[in-house]
A protein has these predicted regions:
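Electropositive phosphate-/nucleotide-binding environments in soluble metabolic enzymes
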Residues: 4-7, 56-59, 106, 122, ...
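Short, small-residue alpha-helix embedded
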Residues: 31, 100-128
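Short, contiguous, well-ordered secondary-structure segments
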Residues: 83-85, 89-91, 111, 115-116
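Short pre-catalytic strand/loop immediately N-terminal to key active-site residues, enriched for Gly-Thr
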Residues: 91-102
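Charged C-terminal helix
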Residues: 134-169
Length: 169
């Protein structure tokens, strides 16, 4: 993924205990799958993007890995992909502004972890990515740059109407 230390740690962790949900950008999950990846620091490389041309190949690859690892994968990017051994979903919510600030991957990871407490990994990942993407779209409309966008993203996620949440009471 982004460093040999991080990659080796992830590989070792996967031998000790496989998480129910493994989230990463395309470069990270390609690397974890033993494929060539083109990461730039912690970001996915421009060559590691989900496209119409590679969609079916990547879906097959990641479904095989999800089955091998007995987990669900959330591959983030301009278009997110959630893959389990028997299901696949694509999420197109979000905005390029989300890649211009630090921490969106961590935020999404925490949302996924929260949702895992109340549902299965596939539903948790699809719901988290969709809702976080919607919050990003709303935040972009109300911000003037990356600083205000970051604050607005938190506010928009916090203020999503209860009926927009899958897990509302």
């Amino acid at each position: 993924a982004c460093s040999s230390l991080r990659y080796e740690f992830a590989q070792k962790l996967m031998t000790i205990h496989m998480p129910q949900l493994l989230k990463g950008n395309m470069s990270e999950l390609l690397a974890m799958s033993g494929q060539t990846a083109h990461a730039i620091g912690i970001d996915a490389g421009a060559q590691d993007v989900l496209t119409d041309a590679n969609c079916s190949h990547l879906k097959k690859l990641f479904q095989e890995k999800a089955a091998q690892w007995n987990t669900t994968l959330l591959i983030t990017g301009k278009k997110d992909m959630v893959v389990s051994p028997d299901k696949c979903a694509f999420i197109t919510n979000g905005t390029p502004a989300m890649s211009q600030i630090t921490g969106t991957g961590c935020m999404l990871g925490m949302i996924c972890a929260t949702y895992l407490a109340v549902t299965d990994p596939f539903t948790a990942a699809v719901t988290a990515a969709t809702e976080f993407g919607i919050a990003g779209e709303k935040a972009e409309k109300n911000s003037s740059g990356p600083g205000s966008f970051q604050v607005e993203l938190l506010d928009q996620f916090y203020n999503l109407p209860a009926q927009d949440y899958l897990f509302s009471q």
